[in-house]
Structure formats: structure tokens, C-alpha cells
């Protein structure tokens, strides 16, 4: 039965959607600055295939508690660990979209893989976005990161309008309809400003290169080839190269928000991995 609840996970109350049942658990970890509702195209497909689907809102986003602190990846990974323990999940597959991929990587480093059966990095920010002398392949410069932060501080409505256009576009052309884009803006606006800025800083600066090397469970890297937000060459391609045993699936002509724009292809790749891992 599909249920929604608010659960105390360590220091934060998280809104959790849990389809229940005895199927293998799949935990969906949303991207910035959205909520669990951004998985609307995945939850029914996974449930119909017999999986137990858990989609939660990260602290500070959606319908979860919005504290003034805790927007670093160690804390966010602890929140995820608390959810997994509280729901007593085993053989779970973690699916991290965009910044959610960072939580997957950091969870493995801090909490191990005993309860996991696999992980998925979907349009994920791993291994390390920030370009530096130590990370010349990083797709994000310090100047661009500061520009993004300043834009969000100046006018969040305008920022989210521009962000969702880039999120869903390939070569400037939207890959979703306007109703879908406006719904995504609505999810963005549910975010707390402190949380949005804190997580923006976290995913812009975090380095997951060592975290990824710890992963030994079956792994899928799923990414759009036309991602303008988290370019494939500086993220998905490197994540796949770092995790030697990982499976790579590149969605053709797909933007960052590929789980919505290319939902059928995304779901086919995800279900194929879940059934084979």
C-alpha cells in the first residue's frame, strides 16, 4: 500500500513516501532543489514491476523539516542511513539523481554496503564538480559557482525559472511541456533558502573521488548525453571510469532532467539494472 509519513531521522523529520510490500526496496534520492515528488514518473513504474519504492524529501526541501543547519554531505548521508535503518531495509538499491548521487557515494563511505544490493548514479554530480589544479576535468569553475549563488540570493523566482529551462533543455529547446516545467518550479519553491544555498555549496565543492573507490556493489551510471547542468564528460563519464565494474547507460538527446523528459528510456534502463543486479 502506498503510504506517506513523516519520520524522525536522527535530527530531522523527513517526509517519506513508501509503497510498501515485500519487493526489493529501491530508495530514490532527489536532486536539487526538488523533492521526492520529482520521481513521479518512476514510482508507479517501479511499483508495477514489483519493487518497494521509497522516495523521501531531503531535509530543507519539499515537505520535510527545514532546520537551519545540516546541509553538508556527511549529515545528509546520515539522514539516509537513519531512514534505511528505521525502515529496516536490506538488499536495497539507492538511486541518486544529480546531487543525490553525492549522498549515495558518501553513504557508502560512512555506513558501508551491508544493507545495499546496488547503487545508481543518475545525472549525478560525482566525482567532483569544482574545477581546480587537482581536478582539471571539473565542469564548474569557482567563478561560475559564485555566480550561481549570487543569482539565487538575488531573486530565487527568476533563478528557478532560468534553472528549470536549462534543466530540461537540449540546445536551448525544452524537452518537456510547460506544465511539467511549471510543476518543477513549484517543487523548487518549496525549498528553504538556507537549504538551497547550503546544498548548492555542498554539491559544488564536495569531492567524492575517494568515496566512489569504495563501492563494490553492482553500479549503474545513467546520464543524458546533452546534460547542460551536469555535463556528462565531467561527471558520468568519470564516475563510470572510477567505478571499474559499473555499467554505463547514456540517454540520447537527453537533458539533465532526463528522468522526466525521457522517462520511458530512463525507466527501461533502471528496471533492466534492477532485474539483473
State what each model feature region is.
Residues 15-69:
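Conserved HGGG/HGGXW glycine-rich cap/lid loop of the alpha/beta-hydrolase fold
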Residues 32, 92, 96-98:
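Conserved alpha/beta-hydrolase "nucleophile elbow" surrounding the catalytic nucleophile
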Residues 254-267:
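Catalytic histidine-centered segment of alpha/beta-hydrolase-like enzymes
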Residues 130-139, 150-213:
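Conserved alpha/beta-hydrolase catalytic His-Asp/Glu region
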Residues 228-234:
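Conserved alpha/beta-hydrolase "acid-adjacent" motif
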Residues 75-92:
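Conserved acidic catalytic loop of the alpha/beta-hydrolase fold
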Residues 105-110, 114-154:
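Flexible "cap/lid" loop of the alpha/beta hydrolase fold
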Residues 215, 221-223, 227:
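Short beta-strand/loop motif that positions the catalytic acidic residue
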Amino acid at each position: 500500500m502506498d503510504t506517506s509519513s513523516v519520520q524522525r531521522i536522527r535530527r530531522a523529520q523527513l517526509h517519506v513516501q513508501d509503497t510498501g510490500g515485500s519487493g526489493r526496496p529501491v530508495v530514490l534520492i532527489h536532486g536539487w532543489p526538488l523533492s521526492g515528488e520529482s520521481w513521479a514518473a518512476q514510482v508507479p513504474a517501479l511499483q508495477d514491476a514489483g519493487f518497494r519504492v521509497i522516495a523521501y524529501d531531503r531535509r530543507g526541501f519539499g515537505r520535510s523539516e527545514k532546520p537551519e543547519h545540516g546541509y553538508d554531505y556527511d549529515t545528509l548521508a546520515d539522514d539516509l542511513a537513519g531512514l534505511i535503518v528505521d525502515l529496516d531495509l536490506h538488499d536495497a538499491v539507492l538511486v541518486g539523481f544529480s546531487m543525490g548521487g553525492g549522498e549515495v557515494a558518501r553513504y557508502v563511505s560512512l555506513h558501508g554496503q551491508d544493507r545495499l544490493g546496488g547503487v545508481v548514479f543518475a545525472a549525478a554530480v560525482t566525482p567532483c564538480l569544482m574545477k581546480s589544479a587537482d581536478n582539471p576535468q571539473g565542469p564548474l569553475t569557482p567563478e561560475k559557482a559564485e555566480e550561481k549563488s549570487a543569482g539565487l540570493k538575488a531573486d530565487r523566482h527568476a533563478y528557478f525559472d532560468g534553472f528549470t529551462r536549462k534543466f530540461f533543455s537540449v540546445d536551448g529547446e525544452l524537452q518537456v511541456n510547460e506544465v511539467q516545467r511549471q510543476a518543477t518550479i513549484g517543487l523548487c519553491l518549496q525549498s528553504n533558502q538556507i537549504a538551497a544555498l547550503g546544498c548548492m555549496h555542498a554539491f559544488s565543492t564536495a569531492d567524492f573521488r575517494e568515496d566512489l573507490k569504495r563501492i563494490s556493489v553492482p553500479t549503474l551510471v545513467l546520464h543524458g548525453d546533452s546534460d547542460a547542468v551536469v555535463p556528462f564528460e565531467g561527471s558520468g563519464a568519470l564516475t563510470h571510469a572510477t567505478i571499474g565494474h559499473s555499467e554505463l547507460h547514456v540517454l540520447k538527446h537527453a537533458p539533465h532532467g532526463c528522468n522526466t523528459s525521457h522517462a520511458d528510456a530512463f525507466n527501461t534502463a533502471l528496471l533492466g539494472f534492477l532485474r539483473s543486479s
